[in-house]
Amino acid sequence: MTMRSVYYTGAGETLVTWQIDVDGAALAQRSAVTLPAPAMYGWPDNAREHFYMVCSDGGPYPENKHHYATAWKLAANGDLAPHGEPLTLPARPIHASLDRAGKHLLIAYNMPSMFTVHRIEGDGRIGGQVEQTASEFGLYGHQILATPNDNGVLFVCRGTDAGRTRPEDPGSLHTFAYDDGRLTHRRTIALGDNGLGFGARHLDFHPSGRFITLCVERQSRLMVFGLSQDGDLTPEPLHDVGTLSRPSNGRQAAGFIRMHPSGRFVYLSNRSFGWLDDGQRVADDSESDLVAFALDPETGAPSLLQHVDPGLFHIRNAGIDPSGRLLVCTSIEPARMPDGSIKPAMLAALRIGDDGRLTPANNYPVDVGRRQIFWSGMVDLR
């Protein structure tokens, strides 16, 4: 087996490394480590010598108590070993990434919505925090990424749906100038009614550096924005399409977004939430699938290729191997199907054709108990 990538799954405090056989579209568990709190998001350094994971013991609201950023030594085979003591964070981290130089760890938080920036020491450990003057934090931060030229940062804020006793919180997309760990606010993009009806979740960069693709979670949309060389975005999307194939009566939300290495295709998930019955997730007729789009190389315009059901419920995360031939995705937790059967939490491996279409290959049930596979991701070992 030739290994160029590994896939990580974080179920609670357990972070599992999976070997990948791209030719066979197969995965096998290799090793596992224990985190100080449940996995939230992970990111490797450029040299693939270190790996960073942010962790928290609770959900989206601030009653949880333990939040950390952790550094790990990353072996050539993908195994992880602790590297320094966990850094205590002020709130629940929801996303983390390194800047393009690998000198700073950028961390997004949802409640309160904010970000912090931390230096990376020469030995790969997490260092001190970089003080910021920026205060444009939006509502319900969800992702923070440095732009390809490392001169900008994009901060995605999802907002929240209205509840029984609270109104909707608006979503927004914030652009910042970036210089050696310091952010200066440039622009707030709040589509709809000042961000109402704009539940942005995650973005990914086109390899040309001219576009971003944005998953708008709460409205199940794919948007494409222009990206300038200085890291700013067009104030309006260049393109905007829906991700669902049919209407449903249940709660829907788009999930992950992943750009194909070639830039010719982009993939998203449509998530079904169902409802809770005595703590058990129960599926309904909502759409739970993957959707593939082709992207015009000149304009970035998306055109639908296919919807495919990988046999998973509530598909939260995915990764694509660097050859562009395999997509791996994960469901978040078990669910009871309408026929009474239990569909376990699972990993699914799908082949990617030259035309960008997905073909399901292998599924791997995982016993997570009452935990969730909140984060999973592909790491190219280079």
What are these regions (language model features)?
Residues 9-13, 60-67, 108-113, 162-171, ...:
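Short, solvent-exposed loop/turn segments at conserved positions within beta-propeller repeat blades
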Residues 80-148:
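Asp-box/WD-like beta-propeller blade repeats and closely related beta-sheet repeat scaffolds
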Residues 254-299, 303-343:
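Loop/turn-rich, solvent-exposed surfaces of beta-rich toroidal or solenoidal domains
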Residues 28-34, 81-87, 128-134, 184-193, ...:
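A short beta-strand motif characteristic of beta-propeller blades
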Residues 333, 339-355, 359-382:
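Blade-level signature of beta-propeller repeat domains, shared across WD40, Kelch, NHL, RCC1
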Residues 18-25, 71-79, 117-126, 175-183, ...:
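Short loop/turn segments immediately following beta-strands, especially the blade-tip
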Residues 36-47, 89-100, 135-151, 193-211, ...:
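Beta-rich, blade/repeat-based domains predominating
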